[in-house]
Swiss-Prot record:
It is found in: Endoplasmic reticulum membrane. This is Cholesterol 25-hydroxylase-like protein 1, member 2. Its cofactor is Fe cation. The keyword Mitochondrion does not apply. Residues 134-265 form the Fatty acid hydroxylase domain.
Amino acid sequence: MTLAHIFQTIWDFGTKDSVLQPIWDYVRLNHSETLRSPLFPVVLTVSSYFVLVLPYLSCDILGRKWPAIYRYKIQPDKLPTTAMLLHCSGVTLYNHILLVIPAAVAQWMWRPPIPLPEQAPTLLELVGGVTGNLLLFDLQYFIWHFLHHKIRWLYVTFHAIHHNYSAPFALATQCLGGWELVTVGFWTTLNPVLLRCHLLTTWMFMVVHVYVSVEDHCGYDFPWSTSRLIPFGVYGGPSKHDVHHQKPNTNFAPHFSHWDKMFGTHADFRFSKPRE
């Protein structure tokens, strides 16, 4: 089998209408009221966040008692304390009560139910849409992040809370000021609309975005980390973001590496070698 034939097979599979259609038909026909609710995207992202944080939180709580996992800790001498975990939990809870829940209720009250298209996206459209949204968000947040580090007032007023800790951990992902949380939520909601994504693609992007954001802050460089699965240093991952918390004027892009390399803010990072 030639390389061209392999690529053709992958392309044909990715562009087949029928691959995702059975899944989409099932959820659309059996759970339409839930999916059409303006509350659904909010519930999806919030629940995804807490579910995805839990495994990393377990790693932080068990710490050195779990050597098979602890050997992948990027900064092994800096485990989050109980006080740090409680502080980040409190900030996250405060933001959700003050900002996320009221915004969700407002959408539920004033936004009409969302129509569900009958046709599912192709697999290629789904993957391309998720990737496109991540790349667009990466540019937006790179600019926002750069400005909030370079302009002192912006940093102190809005972003400094996220840099309370030089060694990131999963619960610190949403240890954010209200302005930053609103900005991130706005882009996450707007970008799929700008890219005219299918609803299934939009929801998949939201879950993937939550996952990679939590992974970036987890403080562990596992063999299955996204940055190790994507070759050529295109994707930064937890090691890259860990360096940002140690050297705050570097590595501003949240996920990928190209913007920092283009604008001279890239700081080299080494993938952690597991300790024996």
